[in-house]
Every structure is written in C-alpha cells, then in structure tokens.
C-alpha cells in the first residue's frame, strides 16, 4: 500500500475507529483533497501533520483538526487490521491507487468513494458493468427473471455489481 493510500485509509476507513470519532465522509475527503491539490500537499503528507498543521496549512477548524489527529492516532492499529484483511483476500483500493476504476472517477468525479473494499478478481473493476438492486421479497417468477437477466448480462461479458444488501440481487 502506498503512503497516499495509507493516508486515505487512515482518514476515511471505518476500521478501528473510536466510537467518538467519525472517519471522513466522501464529500469531506473530496473537499480536503481539493484543498490539498490547490496548495500542493499530497495525501501522504497528512500522515505527519499536527493539529496545528491542519489549521495553519489546510485552514481546518480546531474541531476538525482534533478529529483529524484522532484519526491519525489509529494508524498503527489500522495497519494491523488492513494486514489481517489482506491475509483474508480482502483488498482496500483508494483513489490514489492505479487499480481504482477509471470509469468511476470519470463518471462520479469528486463524488467517487475515496476507498472501497473488494475481494476476488480485481480485473472486473475495469470491465463494463451493470448494477442490479432488488426487493427482499420476490415471487418465484421475479427471482427467475432476475437470474435470467443476470445470466444474459454475464453472457454479454459485463460484470454484475450489487450493493450487497439483502435482496433479489444478492
């Protein structure tokens, strides 16, 4: 994992977070990333920032600076947690990674998630994809329709994407 990816994970991951500290939401990370780009600060630079640096260099409020430093405090435990995930075949991909889907960045721009967790064949992240969502309660006919539709989608060389919530799509 690159230092830029470590920084994004440190500020945006929900792993190893204290109950009284929230990781940055995608919109918050996007706003911070825009500030950093404007003044030439790379995400990895944040790993050595103090609360005062967040205030003076990035113009953060004292409350926000405290939140950022609290998120930084978990970097060691987060590194162990990420290593555990990696050992189980679960990977974290951040906006800073080459593996991050270009289509996602192009379509969503600043709204794209700063990171996501994935497992399996990462090459599908760069294929055309169709997303499916559906109700939890479906009739047998609806379930068959979903299976047939997904089979045709896969047969046409599209990846199938699901949000993972319980429903006909999972």
Q: Each PLM stretch: what is its role?
A:
Residues 102, 147-158, 167-170:
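Acidic/glycine-enriched connector segments
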Residues 89-91, 157-160:
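Short active-site oxyanion
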Residues 1-144:
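Short, positively charged patches
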Residues 163-164:
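Structural motif
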């Amino acid at each position: 994992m690159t230092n830029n990816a470590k920084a994004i994970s440190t500020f945006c991951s929900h792993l190893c977070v204290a109950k009284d500290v929230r990781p940055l939401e995608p919109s918050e990370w996007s706003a911070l990333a825009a500030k950093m780009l404007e003044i030439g600060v790379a995400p990895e630079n944040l790993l050595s920032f103090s609360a005062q640096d967040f205030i003076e260099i990035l113009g953060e409020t004292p409350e926000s600076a405290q939140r950022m430093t609290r998120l930084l405090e978990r970097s060691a435990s987060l590194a162990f947690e990420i290593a555990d995930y990696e050992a189980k075949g679960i990977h974290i991909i951040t906006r800073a990674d080459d593996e991050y889907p270009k289509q996602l960045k192009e379509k969503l721009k600043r709204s794209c998630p700063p990171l996501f967790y994935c497992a399996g064949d990462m090459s599908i992240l760069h294929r055309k994809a169709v997303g499916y969502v559906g109700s939890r309660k479906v009739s047998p006919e609806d379930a068959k329709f979903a299976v047939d539709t997904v089979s045709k989608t896969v047969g046409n060389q599209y990846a199938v994407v699901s949000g993972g919530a319980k429903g006909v799509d999972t």
